[in-house]
Structure formats: structure tokens, C-alpha cells
């Protein structure tokens, strides 16, 4: 196939293409204009074979044209030395030539399908070729562990691990600086950690060649090889600054046609500052060489960022809009209320004061904590006065005077119609206690409330009165006739009132007052 010319391959591919187009038109006419799909092509083995042959010829034509364009003095594939002659059985070369070749490599300007990582995340020194040579078994044939020189915190020098006291030796021992001849001997025997590109290029490696039309790698142009070796990925800040400084020094060393004194004075102090101490090398390069032609700065490719607003900013904006809308509505509502209030107000003179329409609200406080007692007038029977042994004339005159004065003092507290026998006789047991008759609970109580309540006697006074009444009168008084006394006692007696006694502080026995049953009082006390 290597001897075939590009024109022959193009003629064969054009003939196959014409046959395939004719079959596609016939298929579309037979199937109502439907185009042939992959399943339809697989059902026709002859057409499928033609499709495969056509794709093989197109890829072969492309590879041959690419080789002639980039490497016109290339050696034929048959004349190239084979890498492993013992591995290929006889006759396999012809069979491999007849087989379908692999897909041709993409051109240098084609877009890669999916990169493994972003170029900004790579170090320009860690190229794939360096890693492939570092971890290839052919490079470290005599090393026990090739990863020993690449991974680990152990200090190393020229691929050998340094001991604790190796740095103290100055006598040209194992730690002395190796010469060029020693380096040449060590490189082939021991594994080395690649430090620079030059060291990696000196590692001996067998040429990897394959038998077939795509045996060697695609030759790259000078610009592409430089970009891959020097600027494989986005350069770091330190490397880019170094490049700018080197270019600066090269431009500064060239003699300028008319150097001025100001330029010389400004260039001297800038050259004294080291590159790693300068703040911005790119700004310094632009200021010192405004018209110089140097390396254009390479734009650092960064990951795309979201240019628009974030979610929180959008939510906050919506909230602000809603609050502004609510504020406007509230202002309008307040204006309407103010207008209505102004229309409803009238003149103060035309308004009539209405006092009885709405009762004033009074907040209720604590209820009554003490029992309210409504005292009623108590009528007690008068006691009989003790008669002293004196002359009848004196007693009669005194009694008449006293009775007249006392009756004038308290006339309304005595019951009318009291018989004189009751005054002389022994009082009943009810005289010891206050009289509370059920008849007093009737409506007549309200009539008697107009009268001033009389002071009730205390318990000790009543006992004293009862004892004084029970005492038998002396025999002399009983033997004497008392017609005058009986006539005088028909009049109501006065009632003694103690001014210090209080009407509310006395024991009351209101048995039938608000009682639902015998013995159940207001608070349900047991008697």
C-alpha cells in the first residue's frame, strides 16, 4: 500500500463513493424517500463491505498526504528497521497491510474531544513525556524501586538517598560534586529524578516503532515542538516572570541607536533589584520597554465563572421590590383614611353632647372580701329596776321624774301595748338573746329602716340584767302596797344604749336566712 500513489487511492475512493450514492438513491426511491440507516446497511453485506473499504481508503489517502506534506524525505515503511523481528510471524506483514488501518490522528489545529484536566492545573514541567520516561521500566532497568527517586521525603542527590552525616563530608567522597565523566557513567546505571528538561533528554530510550502505515509519530513543526516543550501548559507566575526578565536583559544588552541620560539613569536601579523581589515584572517590563518587541503575555485560561447574580442576590432583590410595593400601598391607604377622617369631622359648635346614650365603661376591680351584714333594729324587753329600801314618797317622786325624762329621750324603741305584768314578772329566756323573729324579714323591715337603730346590749350586760332581775326583792318592799308603782310602769321604759358598742359586732343566729336546708348556712358550716 505504501507504493500506491495518492491519485490511485483517490480514484478508487471516488468510484466506491459513486456506487454507494447510486445505491442510496435507489433505496430512497424504494422506501418513499427515507434515507438508509445503519441497520439497513448491515442487512446488505455487499454494501457494508463497500462502506468499510471507502472509509479505509479515505483514511489512507489522508495519512499519505500528511506524510508527504510534513516529511517529504521520509523513508519507505519497508526499509525501516523493525523493533521486534522475532515477535512477528512470517506472513503477518502482508496480512496487516490488507487489514483496515486505524483511524488517522487528528491534525494539530483540531479541538480535543475531552481534556483530562484543565491546563491551569498542570505544572509546565510535568509533561506527559517526562512522566512516561520517569515511570518506564526501560529507563530504570538496574534500579530496585523506580518510585524511590520520585516519591518520598528522604533527601537525595543524583538519585541516591543522603544519610544523616553525608552533608558534612568535604573530602571528595560520595557527597562531592560529581564530574561530567562520573555523571555520564551514573546516568546509565542508576535511576535519577529528572530536575530539568535537559536531563530528561539525555535518558537513553529505544525508539518505539510499529510495523504498518502508522509506524512512527506524526512529525511536528518547529513552532509546535517549541510550544510543547517550553509552554506545554499555562506557565506559572514565577516562570513567566523569569521569561520576561530574560527577554528584558537580552533587549537591554543590544546597543540602542541614541541612548539618553534619563533612560540610563532609570535602567540602572531597576537592574539591581532581583527578579524574585520585584512586585510586578509585567508592569516593569511594559514601563521600561514601551516600544520593544518582546514576548506577548499569554492569557491564563481559567475556569468559567458565573457572571450573573447569585441566588441570594436575586432573592434579596425580589424582597426589596415587594417591600417597596407594600410601602406604596400603605402610603395610599393612609392618604385615603386621612381624607375620610377630614370629611367625617364636623364643627364643634354643631355637635350636641350626648351623655346618656353610651354608659361609661368602668373596670371591675376585686370583689368584696368581707361579708356584708345588714343590721336590723333589735327590740329587747326592758328590765325591771331594782327598788331600794327608801320611803315611798321619795321613790314615787324619783320614778315619776326619771320616767318622764327617759320616755322623752327614747320613746320609739319600746313596743306599744306592753302590759305591766311583764315588767314585774321574770323575763323569758329570749331576753338573754337578741330577738330575730321571722316576721321581721318581711317587707315591714323597709319601713323600720327609717328609724335610727338602737344600740344592742352586750352579752355581759344582758347577763348582769338577768341576774339583777332574778334576785328576789326584799320582803319589806313586797309587803308594802305598790299601787302607784304599777300605775307608773304601764308607761314604756327607756332603753339604755352603750355608745362604745358597735352594731355589727354581735352574734347573730339567722337560721332561715338563705338556707336550702336545716343546718346549711352560707358557707356550709356544721353546728
Curated annotation (Swiss-Prot):
Q: Where in the cell is it found?
A: Cytoplasm; Nucleus
GO terms (molecular function) for this protein are:
DNA replication origin binding; single-stranded DNA binding
Q: Where is the composition biased (Basic and acidic residues)?
A: 60-70, 246-255, 474-499
Q: Which residues form a coiled coil?
A: none
Where in the sequence does UniProt note compositional bias of the Gly residues kind? 518-527
Q: Where is the composition biased (Acidic residues)?
A: 391-407, 438-447
Which portions of the chain have biased composition (kind: Basic residues)?
361-375
Q: Where is the composition biased (Polar residues)?
A: 136-147, 279-291, 342-358
Bias class Low complexity marks the residues at 180-191
Q: Which GO terms describe its cellular component?
A: cytoplasm; DNA replication preinitiation complex
Principal cellular location given in the protein's record: cytoplasm
Q: Which UniProt keywords apply?
A: Cell cycle, Cytoplasm, DNA replication, Nucleus
Show the segment(s) annotated as Disordered.
Answer: 60-226, 244-303, 340-527
Similarity-based family: Belongs to the SLD2 family.
Function of this protein? Has a role in the initiation of DNA replication. Required at S-phase checkpoint.
Q: What is this protein called?
A: DNA replication regulator sld2
